[in-house]
Amino acid sequence: MRLGHISDFHLRYHLAGTSTVLARKSRDMPEKINLAIKRFREEKVDCVVVTGDIVDHPFEDMNIPEYLEKGEADLLLVRDLLDQLDCPVFVVYGNHDHPLLFRRVFSLREESSIVGDFRIHCFYDEEGRNNTPERVGGELERFFEATSNSDEYSQIHIQHYLLYPEKNDGYPHTYLNSTSLIKSASSFGKVTLALSGHFHPGENLVQYQGIYFAVAPAFCEPPHPFRIYDLSRPIIQTQHLNLS
């Protein structure tokens, strides 16, 4: 199976302005996303994963009517772009997305999906105290249920935040309970690959406790990188792509 991975658009088109971080080219995103989708189609990937921060929704006064209307319009724009793909697309929200608007536009994949030889699980987590992400409640229950599944499918787990490695200097990117999550996942041996975004420099594919972990670099920042993973071999291969 060939899996496309792209993350952190921080798009603004209907929403005014741009990200407060000038390196994030929020207003260029519709054109750039379209180019990445074209490449995914050319590469004939079997599915595409988008690991959050679809839109750069304003944090302050995030629920005022104007921001809600334009934020939803921007999510719809991204959905329309992704609809050009002729393969399954898995999207989770990030800390810069409005969770309720995301649910309205994309809905949540709370049931797993099978693509090829893999069962794909999406997890929708939140930041907690001091902006530290944590998997709790229903998402934690779904995680434990997934990792203890005894069927024949290997699993791919999709989330915005990092399970591994620990990247918390300057800003907390890694789950507060990452150690226990990895321990649970590795003990049952069901999880082959865990994909994340959030940490803009990204992290290359690495194997730890029997699981492959990868963090996509932010697509919103030049050279607008994205990846394709080839899972057809025992050792997963990464193809690094960008728009430069």
Residue positions per predicted region:
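Binuclear metal-dependent phosphoesterase catalytic core
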Residues: S184, G202-S244
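Core catalytic region of metal-dependent phosphoesterases/phosphodiesterases
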Residues: D28-V115
